[in-house]
């Protein structure tokens, strides 16, 4: 009964699905994959609701790691935005034992997203000698957690001192919550600085922009997935941005999921796409600040949608932008772009980039 939710149906789609991200290139197969993935994720959410109850659906996202085990009766949820780790179970027998096991595995898991299936209850989390959360969490004595002994002792402390329960219908949900260290975001970002610097030099893209995109897209969560199947730290989509980058590099096809879940490959691909937006798709914009605003917005909603804000003719759109001040371009994109998400995206990335430039 390992595949209690019949999620074996999802496995083939997980290999090839894509999303409506970051580009204007679409094809029929991509649309079918995206729609199919969305339908199956809706079914996944429905089945989780059947097991956990109304308003208890938690699914992995760009800034949320969620892993179910124990026939979907136990889950680990890392909220990378809020900096909290919540371990919960609805197991009817020995709930503390289920929680203890999940706490230890979550604290000691590695940083290889390609080895973990977030859409099944398979216990495929391996304990790592260099845990992904090392330094982002400290135990009750204020020490970082690297080894199983310390993780086990901390789990025992949590179960004794922080165990909570709540009722949802006939179900009792037991949980413990762990707060990450205040600078957990910086701790994660630091893991990838070398990769960011390498990609920055390779493609001529500012390090601060790459970091700001990563923060906004995934909060530096290497396990990041979206309901529309954008993948990894920079939320790259296989059949749009990924395909464009591969084509520009003389490669056929699209990057695989495992390729995009590799942090170095993801950062390289995402940065290559930023360079394409800057140098090719939006290269007709003269002012570098105006072009940066356009590139940021295009990374979220596509270059075509950015240019159409100014004119349906792409050349004319660039000419119009070139008559405007950078401030006017920013104001236009944050107020007139048809996508509310893209309007907010420019504000978020621009704000984050300023903070990285000050460091």
Swiss-Prot record:
Residues 1-16 form the signal peptide. The keyword Protein biosynthesis does not apply. It catalyses: Exolytic cleavage of the (1->4)-beta-glycosidic linkage between N-acetylmuramic acid (MurNAc) and N-acetylglucosamine (GlcNAc) residues in peptidoglycan, from either the reducing or the non-reducing ends of the peptidoglycan chains, with concomitant formation of a 1,6-anhydrobond in the MurNAc residue. The keyword Cell wall biogenesis/degradation applies. A lipid is attached at residue 17 (S-diacylglycerol cysteine). It is found in: Cell outer membrane. It comes from the Bacteria. Its EC number is 4.2.2.n1. It is a lipid-anchor. Keywords: Cell outer membrane, Cell wall biogenesis/degradation, Lipoprotein, Lyase, Membrane, Palmitate, Signal. GO terms for molecular function: hydrolase activity, acting on glycosyl bonds; peptidoglycan lytic transglycosylase activity. One of its GO terms (biological process) is peptidoglycan metabolic process. Murein-degrading enzyme. May play a role in recycling of muropeptides during cell elongation and/or cell division. Belongs to the transglycosylase Slt family. NCBIfam families: PRK11671.1. This is Membrane-bound lytic murein transglycosylase C. It comes from Shigella dysenteriae serotype 1 (strain Sd197).
């Amino acid at each position: 009964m390992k595949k209690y939710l019949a999620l074996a149906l999802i496995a083939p789609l997980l290999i090839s699905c894509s999303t409506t991200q970051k580009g204007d290139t679409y094809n029929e197969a991509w649309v079918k994959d995206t729609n199919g993935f969305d339908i199956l994720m809706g079914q996944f959410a429905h089945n989780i609701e059947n097991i956990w109850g109304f308003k208890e659906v938690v699914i992995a996202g760009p800034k949320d790691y969620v892993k179910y085990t124990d026939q979907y009766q136990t889950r680990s949820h890392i909220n990378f935005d809020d900096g909290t780790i919540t371990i919960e179970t609805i197991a009817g027998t020995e709930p503390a034992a289920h929680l203890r096991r999940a706490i230890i595995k979550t604290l000691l898991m590695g940083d290889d997203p390609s080895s973990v299936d977030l859409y099944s209850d398979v216990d495929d989390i391996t304990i790592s000698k260099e845990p992904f959360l090392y330094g982002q969490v400290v135990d009750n004595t204020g020490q970082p957690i690297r080894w199983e002994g310390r993780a086990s002792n901390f789990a025992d402390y949590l179960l004794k001192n922080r165990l909570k329960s709540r009722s949802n219908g006939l179900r009792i949900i037991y949980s413990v919550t762990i707060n990450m260290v205040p600078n957990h975001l910086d701790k994660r970002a630091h893991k990838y600085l070398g990769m960011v610097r390498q990609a920055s030099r390779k493609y001529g893209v500012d390090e601060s922009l790459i970091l700001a995109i990563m923060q906004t897209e995934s909060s530096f969560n290497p396990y990041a997935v979206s309901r529309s199947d954008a993948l990894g730290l920079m939320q790259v989509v296989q059949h749009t941005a990924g395909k464009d980058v591969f084509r520009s590099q003389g490669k056929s096809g699209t990057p695989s999921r495992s390729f995009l879940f590799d942090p170095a490959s993801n950062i390289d691909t995402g940065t290559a796409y930023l360079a394409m937006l800057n140098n090719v798709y939006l290269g007709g914009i003269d002012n570098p600040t105006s072009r940066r605003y356009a590139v940021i917005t295009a990374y979220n909603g596509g270059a075509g949608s950015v240019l159409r804000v100014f004119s349906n003719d792409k050349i004319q759109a660039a000419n119009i932008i070139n008559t405007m001040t950078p401030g006017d371009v920013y104001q236009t994109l944050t107020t007139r772009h048809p996508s509310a998400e893209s309007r907010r995206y420019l504000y978020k990335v621009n704000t984050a980039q300023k903070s990285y430039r000050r460091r």
